[in-house]
Amino acid sequence: MDLNEESAPSGVLFEEDVAEQEAKMANGGPKKGKKLEEPYRLEIVWFNVLWFVLLHAGALYGVYLIFASAKIYTTLYGFLLCELSLLSITAGVHRLWAHRAYKAKWPLRLTLMVLNLLAYQNSIYEWARDHRVHHKFSETNADPVNAKRGFFFSHVGWLLCRKHPEVRAKGGRIDLSDLERDPIVMFQKRHYYKLVPFVSFVIPTLIPMYFWGETLSNSWYVSTMFRYCLSLNLTWLVNSAAHMWGNKPYDKNINPVENLAVAIGSLGEGWHNFHHVFPWDYKTSELGNYSLNFTNAFIDLAVLLGLAYDLKTVPVSMIKTRVGRTGDGSHDVWGWGDKDLPKELADQTMIENRKTE
């Protein structure tokens, strides 16, 4: 793709954006962007390169220590922190703050904010801003994780270089007023780099040492370095693999796909073709199966506890209409007789040993 071309809007963020997007598609889709005044040049941030090389090296050593000397409690603790980190991304900054797919009372918002510090994937404010840009300008130069620039770039490379000028330009136009009205979000934004070292690195390292006598080395490399690196890569797969490998039952014209492996690893974020078509649905999928969408179960539990409310979801009629209009024909059917079974497949099906009247 041309990295010197200005990006045009390509997606929606919230339920109220649908009418605007439908009108644009009716008029022939978004207009082709104009050329940027200055040619884009990739600028590598070598500090970030060094940091991620050391992080992954430390994580690999942590894997060795899991089998060589770390206590089982340390390993289990590391995986628990990894899952909590992922939950802060999926249920918190993604579905709650970036897409406003549901609302949460302050105890849940505070909990998700603290866990977001553990995840250390940028502040809620910055993460939500970049993600809104990603949806609004998906697979264009304004997309921070543009998958058309390859797997490596969309997975981790985007963190190793300066943002494309279009990302900065379009990011400055995204409405963030709802985040700015949230005191919990703004508190974290103001104090983010003072809190992250303690919540994401110091405390996770000290707890195994204090409570079950783990060594400093095992605690640091397993429950901190390995845990952090694993949670990062499971999150990044949503940007890379879930934009490349899978089927497109809801819209065959966009890059995001349905990817079961990513869904399992990321607590339900792999149903990405659905999510990019209906980003305001709190389930991020058509499925209600908790085993393949743990975040959905967490939000539903929060509802039962009175901590979450106003959950937005897409009606079946809307899904069926979109599947029929833009899907690739891979939408699942339950078997013979399902009204979603394509007629041409039904006509070609052979029925053996047919009962005679």
From Swiss-Prot:
Keyword Lipid biosynthesis set for record: yes
Cofactor binding summary note: Expected to bind 2 Fe(2+) ions per subunit.
Major subcellular site: membrane
Catalyzed reactions: (9Z)-octadecenoyl-CoA + 2 Fe(II)-[cytochrome b5] + O2 + 2 H(+) = (9Z,12Z)-octadecadienoyl-CoA + 2 Fe(III)-[cytochrome b5] + 2 H2O; (9Z)-hexadecenoyl-CoA + 2 Fe(II)-[cytochrome b5] + O2 + 2 H(+) = (9Z,12Z)-hexadecadienoyl-CoA + 2 Fe(III)-[cytochrome b5] + 2 H2O; hexadecanoyl-CoA + 2 Fe(II)-[cytochrome b5] + O2 + 2 H(+) = (9Z)-hexadecenoyl-CoA + 2 Fe(III)-[cytochrome b5] + 2 H2O
Motif (Histidine box-3): 272-276
Highest taxon of the lineage: Eukaryota
Keyword GTP-binding: no
Binding site for Fe cation 2: H134, H243, H272, H276
Any one Gene Ontology molecular-function term assigned to this protein's record: iron ion binding
Membrane-spanning segments: 49-69, 72-92, 195-215, 223-245
Coiled coil: none
EC number: 1.14.19.6
GO BP, sorted A to Z: unsaturated fatty acid biosynthetic process
Cell location: Membrane
Cofactor field: Fe(2+)
Pfam families on file: FA_desaturase (PF00487)
Membrane topology: Multi-pass membrane protein
Keyword terms: Fatty acid biosynthesis, Fatty acid metabolism, Iron, Lipid biosynthesis, Lipid metabolism, Membrane, Metal-binding, Oxidoreductase, Transmembrane, Transmembrane helix
Binding site for Fe cation 1: H94, H99, H131, H135, H275
Motif (Histidine box-1): 94-99
Motif Histidine box-2 mapped to chain: 131-135
Gene Ontology cellular component terms for the protein in this record: endoplasmic reticulum membrane
Reported function: Catalyzes the formation of a Delta12 double bond, acting on monounsaturated fatty acyl substrates like palmitoleoyl-CoA ((9Z)-hexadecenoyl-CoA) and oleoyl-CoA ((9Z)-octadecenoyl-CoA) with higher desaturation activity on (9Z)-octadecenoyl-CoA than (9Z)-hexadecenoyl-CoA. Requires preexisting cis double bond at the Delta9 position of fatty acyls to be able to insert the Delta12 double bond.
Family under the similarity heading: Belongs to the fatty acid desaturase type 1 family.
Protein name, UniProt field: Acyl-CoA Delta12-desaturase
